[in-house]
């Protein structure tokens, strides 16, 4: 380990930590980096930046989120911005803060219900946009200004899965609601919808016209991304909280027991293997430079060829 730091002495941070569930905790969001600094946000509302040597660059408090499970929306970085999605029981906001000093670059109020999903970047019609999901809508915001470009009311309930983009469509889903495919634009429209297999937490992923969904009750499904037709389904013994990842022509989905289910990127069900991590896992793996990084409940793993 190169370094570790405690986040303390943040102006405005609550003296007492807010009440959250044990499943979520105070540090559920995944950290983000611009390659020069790393950024983290916590259930206290503290957001902080460190350089690669562990030196604190800046920190601020965004206000304690009114969130009965705990804040879990991860940060994303693009250019000079850190994007923060901050939906709470008292409404929400989406904002961009500067990577160098943490100052607000833009901020927009969101008149919606609470969510636990993360913002997603997508290039649509030659413009970088931020996609968000919440109850009751999927929305797109201009990355440069934060302006809302469009929204579609199509979700409900406690939204944890983020949006996905591929094949010219925006996908959103939530358990006890529905899976939708939206054609984005000034007048967005729902192209198709399906309510058979829906995620509670895991975000869908699309590639080559195939859309993959992992459910909290153990079903993993593949759909035609253009029509919504189901190609296949697969039943695991445990549910999926981690989002599926596509890499090297394969689909990787780790279940809550720590079994990594590896599928061929194909409209026919082809299970390549089911290796065992050895402990429970609910975080989405990261893939880089031929290696897989997995955060288990107790350990951090790096897996690759020697």
Give the predicted meaning of each segment.
Residues 1-306:
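Noncatalytic, solvent-exposed loop/strand surfaces
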